[in-house]
Amino acid sequence: MPRIAALPDHLVNQIAAGEVVERPANALKEIVENSIDAGATAVDVELEGGGIRLIRVGDNGGGIHPDDIELALHRHATSKIKTLNDLEHVASMGFRGEGLASIASVSRLTLTSRQEDSSHATQVKAEDGKLSSPTAAAHPVGTTIEAAELFFNTPARRKFLKSENTEYAHCATMLERLALAHPHIAFSLKRDGKQVFKLPAQSLHERIAAIVGDDFQTASLEIDSGNSALRLYGAIAKPTFAKGKTDKQYCFVNHRFVRDKVMLHAVKQAYRDVLHNALTPAFVLFLELPPKAVDVNVHPTKTEIRFRDSRQVHQLVFHTLNKALADTRANLTESVSNAGEVLHDITGVTPAPMPSENDSENLFDSASNHPTGNKPDTRNAFGSSGKTAPMPYQAARAPQQHSLSLRESRAAMDTYAELYKKTDDIDLELSQFEQARFGNMPSETPAHKTDTPLSDGIPSQSELPPLGFAIAQLLGIYILAQAEDSLLLIDMHAAAERVNYEKMKRQRQENGNLQSQHLLIPVTFAASHEECAALADHAETLAGFGLELSDMGGNTLAVRAAPVMLGKSDVVSLARDVLGELAQVGSSQTIASHENRILATMSCHGSIRAGRRLTLPEMNALLRDMENTPRSNQCNHGRPTWVKLTLKELDTLFLRGQ
């Protein structure tokens, strides 16, 4: 066995760098935190090659004494703690004294700093862990650190880095977290010479809007609870703002971004009664407590912490959020009994009453009931302000009566005649439907038509297709269909999802891509750094899925083309979900193995949505598609698309024959 020997300092620093500096974002975090601890009021960051080629951070802080500038690059050298008692009460962002030494061991680092009482700045360089002699330099008061060619001397670690776009996204996200925690400091970011953002010193309210977004700010509730010893403040999103991603969840403890299970569990418990399924809340929480009440020396990255009294922290977070959410429970609108009151509170609209059996004239509203002369808006369940909104269980309102001139009446009748003109296809569809519904009932057709035999194209009762024919739509969600000896209930969204999914798979297999169509007017939307990075890395892959997107700059993307098959879908939501899938999948080599998952996400957007009213031909067309689609018994998520109630089961429900 070889003899035991002490490792050289350079190798020790490189080993430590494996924990402290996993990627450029970690190096950026260590450097910016030093600027914050130095009392800087402005921090400027420049990145090249996603932070791999260059990270430059300049600040206007107190600077480093000329005699200490070499020591700043030595391992375990710091000005922030001196005793064990200091470690137990640490209030600074950094304290371990190994960040700069670790970065210097895996990059070409240049440190330039000047204090206010110095006539000139002092500069020192480090390459492969070797320090140069300090030299005089020109520099304003403050410090600038340049870390170039990260991991140039550790190729094994460098090859594990992602693309420049992905690494940049991590750096930008890291800087945004630091900016969010310190709104009193001005931050700026340049990428490859181009300004990305420039945030002045501002209030927390303004900083949240700038980082998290105006949409979050509009849909958020401000919270502030606790006392001088333990305080929780910030903003939490209303349940209606909940998303399927966790990219808008920020926890700060003493202005340090952390991932803490205690706080996250308390938040989840507070939202438990108002959020369901895979939706996650958005929030920006700041917890302030004495430094001795929290241990930040758990991991070199300092994102994991331990509370001395985790129960107290959990109760504060839970009760504060639970109280704030008490009046915004999403399930209030789910109850028919109080839906009218909720609609009135939200929109100022009073729902229309159900017509009574003894008040038949109420089925038609006269123009006097609507002074504006407009029809009630039935585009959604709530309607528009000042108009009557039909309840989900209420039939569509009949057209209003208006007095028309003879010429207007004739024009209107001509229009309606053309609108309701039947085609041969619809006649055949309705004939099949009537045959399936009523069988061979006595005909009420005039006598001179009773001798005409049925067309050979109309199936008899015994020739009904497997899923029968549609007879009605239920609650805007389900299709009722009559088969030979049963009643079928079909989840129209789940069924259409499976049909679209299989069609897209077949089109990809046959053509190699999905057929797309250009939008007349491109649709733009604000994107996250991760979404922009996914577009930059996978633009060709997106084109294969029928999506054409372009980067407009300023974290704004434009959708220029969408799949023909999904022409009626929300293209922004579709683009976001596909970009999210690509970002999660990662490299192009693994996208092929996850192609079906991406297609499943896309098919969901192109499927019939709940609440959409279908005609009988549309419903029957879906049934026929189901019959010709493989695996149409389940949707893409494993849920059944239809259930069957036989005549015997229906008889049992009504106690017939017992």
Curated annotation (Swiss-Prot):
The gene is mutL. The keyword DNA repair applies. GO terms for molecular function: ATP binding; ATP hydrolysis activity; ATP-dependent DNA damage sensor activity; mismatched DNA binding. It comes from Neisseria gonorrhoeae (strain NCCP11945). GO terms for biological process: mismatch repair. This is DNA mismatch repair protein MutL. One of its GO terms (cellular component) is mismatch repair complex. The keyword Transmembrane helix does not apply. InterPro entries: DNA_mismatch_repair_CS, DNA_mismatch_repair_MutL, DNA_mismatch_S5_2-like, HATPase_C_sf, MutL/Mlh/PMS, MutL/Mlh/Pms-like, MutL_C, MutL_C_dimsub. HAMAP family: DNA_mis_repair. Residues 361-372 have a biased composition (Polar residues). Residues 114-130 have a biased composition (Basic and acidic residues). Residues 114-138, 353-405 are annotated as: Disordered. SMART domains: DNA_mis_repair (SM01340), MutL_C (SM00853). Keywords: DNA damage, DNA repair. Pfam families: DNA_mis_repair, HATPase_c_3, MutL_C. PANTHER family: DNA MISMATCH REPAIR PROTEIN MLH, PMS, MUTL, DNA MISMATCH REPAIR PROTEIN MLH1. This protein is involved in the repair of mismatches in DNA. It is required for dam-dependent methyl-directed DNA mismatch repair. May act as a 'molecular matchmaker', a protein that promotes the formation of a stable complex between two or more DNA-binding proteins in an ATP-dependent manner without itself being part of a final effector complex.
